[in-house]
Structure formats: structure tokens, C-alpha cells
Amino acid sequence: MALLGAQLVITLIMVSVIQKLSPHFSLAKWILCSTGLSRYLHPTDDELRKLSGVPREKVKGKKDKRNGHHQANGERSTTFHIPRSLDIRLDTIPIAPYDIVHLRFYTEYQWLVDFSLYSAIVYATSEIYHFFYPLKEEINLSMVWCLLVVFFAFKLLASLTVQYFKSEESIGERSTCIVTGLAYLLIAMIILIVPEHTLEVGLDKAYHSFNTSASSFLEGQGLNSSGPASKIVVKFFIAVSCGILGALFTFPGLRMARMHWDSLKFCKDRLWLKLVLNVSFAMPFLLVILWIKPLARDYLTARVFSGMSSPILSTEAFETIRLGAVVIAVILRFLLMPIYLQAYLNLAHDRVEEQKKEAGRITNVELQKKISSIFYYLCVVTLQYVAPILMCLFFALMYKTLGEYTWSGVLKQSLPLDECSADLEYEKALLATMANERAAVEAHEFQSITPEGEQLPVEDNILTTAQSFQLSLQSLKSVFTKDVYRGLFGFATWWSCFIWFAASSLGMVYQSYFTKS
């Protein structure tokens, strides 16, 4: 309990809230059913017959000798051809809760969005509590919640991408995923050799810190080791992970670009909404720039402009603004989510309008499938919209907490130059304390040796086990320092924002090219 403290209390309360509240309220359902979204209904067979002048066929049944019933030829009686240029007007109705429960991937979408909301509440509550009562030796369980959100989002994106490899008709999509994955792998390899004074992701510092602390940890356990792995091997596996994540972001980015393109087309008269949409689309690019040191940190925290006695921002203020920008970008995307989803649902109307310009004939079943498939895949599109931004958000939250940053950096002055020496003194004191605890545990174990056949009291065994576990936990925490977390989650946050924008930009180029052609 001492290792968890208030974290366990917050987690247990949230688990109880999930159990009591989830049957009555769902943010995922509210987004789809209570934000004004409307779907298009396909015309019925009778309406199509009336518009096209196709007479109703009489069903000729033949007697089934086995059971004596009449069996109709359903395919001939329900399938007929109509002109493609038929003037069809589609009706719209608001999306109701009973309409979406049968949609594909609805359960996965609901779980991801609702669990993300609960995780955000746990994180916010923990941050507020730790602002007044800082962590000492406790485990921050809110990081486990954040990590689970990232895992669920990654798993769902992988599940959606695997669908392209299972279908025999998705050769183009399969090839696109492979090509973009290899392209992102190449880009990641190039980025990983960029020096730290240009792109401040902190991977080199993280590797050095992890290598040093891991070697010390292994030596303390009586194992000789020069380090876990070479830097080139570590960076290669990071690049492979970047390529895989880039492949998973490809079709969500293409879908996002199409929805953005259609949203701009439907809001030509509302310039303020068009401006907000464009700002939201460009926000990931601004986030990418904030990690480029000559364009962001050096310009805002080091350069002194004429007429000023100090830089515009302190180091702490810059870190806070960078983290806040990620949160603002994600919140803005969530606020614009109904507009983007309605732009997707309007594809049914666009398909009918495009079909009116074509010659030839189409069956009623094909027309109805063309219209109804838009709504059928609504939750798939919503997952493609939500999962990438949730990964960016919770990577940034983990980067802030595990990297030991603060949300109030704008209100603080820049720390003095001896900050590093103060941190070094703290680490030395921590190592000395760990050494003393290890010596105490060993002395206690030596004193607890009893003659053969005798047993230690249960209280002594429990105390010794607890002390050994706490010592092992402290040793493990000394391996994963804040520099390791800053490098790992800093790069994960930056790369997620980069491929978020790159995939969307690729989709916009695609839309521009094929629209003009």
C-alpha cells in the first residue's frame, strides 16, 4: 500500500465509476447520436420501381415436393435494373442509438473512446493530487492507464490494417501499406542520425543514461556486462517500430484528408469554420516544428531580441507550451469530429450525384449497397479518426509525467545553471540510501540464520520479503531514469505527430490530384 498510496485509491474509485456509469452513459455513443449527425436512407424497391417505371413482377412459386410448401425465386423477384441517371432524392434521418449497435467495430470504438475518457480523468485527478502532494516512493498508476490506451489504440489500428491483408480484393490497399511502411522506415533511419542539436528528441541522451544505469544494475546483481545493446541495434529496432506505426497511420491519414477535403467543400459560406478546420489540419505540422531546435527552442528560449533583456520564454515555459500545444491540437480535433463525420456520411449523397452523370444501368441491390455501406462503415472511419489522436495525446501525457515536466512552467522562472548538479546530488543520495538498505537487508538475513529444523517467525519473513522487493523496485527505477523516459516518449510523441501530419498531407495531395484530373 505504501508503494501505491493514493494511486490505488484513485484507480479503485474509477473502476467503480466505470462499473456503475458505463451502462447509462457512453461518450462514444453520445458523439454519434447526440451531436446532430444524420445518415442517408437508400430508396426502397417500390420507390425505385416507381421512379424508373419498372413494373412489379409477379412472384411465381413452385411447389416443393419435400414439404408441400411453395418456394419463390427471390433473386428474380427482388433484383431489377434501373438507369444510372435516374433522379433519386435521398431522405435523411438522425442517427439513433439502436442504429449503431449493429455497426461493424462499434464495440471496439465504444471501448476505446470510453476507456480513454476514464483514463484522462484518472490522469487529471492524479496530476492535481500530486501538485499538492508530490510523489515520493509511490508508483504512478495513471501511467498504466495511459499505456493501456496506447496499447488499445495500436491494437485496433493493427486490426483494421490486417483486414486489407485478409481480403483478396484489397491488393491496392495491401501494396500501399507495405510501400508506406518501407518509406517511413527509411525516413525514420534518416531522422535517427540527425544530431540532437537539430532535432531534440533526446534518444542519444536516453541511450547513454540507460546504458550506464543498466550496467551498474547488472554489476550490483553480480553480473558482468558492458551494456544491454549497441546504439545502432537499438536505433534499428526503433526505426522498424516507426515504420510499422507509419503503415498503421496511412489509411487513417488518407481518410482524414478526404473528410477534410469534403468539409471545406461544405462550409464555403462559413469562413470562420473553414479557418478553424485549416488550423486544426495544420496543427500537427506546428507540433513537429516545436521539436526542431533551431526553429523553436533556440529562437524562443535563447535568442534575445532587440529591446528585450531576456529571451521570450524560459526553458520550463517552452516545455509547458509544447505539451499544451499537443493537448490543444487533440481537443480541437475532437471538437471538430462531428463536422468531419458528417462530411463522411455525405458521401452517400455525393455517390448518387456522381452516378447521375454516368450512362448505363445498375441493379437496385447495387445501388442500395452503395448508399448503405457508408453508414455501415461509420465506426471503422471513426476509429481511424480517433485512434491516431489518442496515441499522440497519451504519448504526450506520459512524456510529461515520466519526464518530470510541469504544467505550470509558464509561471516559473528558468532554473539556475547548477540544476544538473542538484540532480546529480539527489541521484548520489538515492544511490547511497539504496546501498544502506541493501546492507541492512543482508545483515538482517545474516542474523536470521537459524539452526536446521527451526523456522523464522512469519513476521520476519514478511518484513524481509517486503524490504527485498522495495530494494529491487528502487534498483529498477534507477535504471529507467527521467532521461530515458524523456528520450523514449519524447520521440514517440514527435513521431506520432509527424506521421499524423504526413499521412494527412499525402491524402490531401492525392485528393488534389484526382479532383483536378
Which positions does each model-derived feature cover?
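Alpha-helical transmembrane segments of secretory-pathway, organelle, and plasma-membrane proteins
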Residues: 1-46, 83-100, 104-517
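Charge-rich, low-complexity intrinsically disordered and helical linker regions
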Residues: 48-90
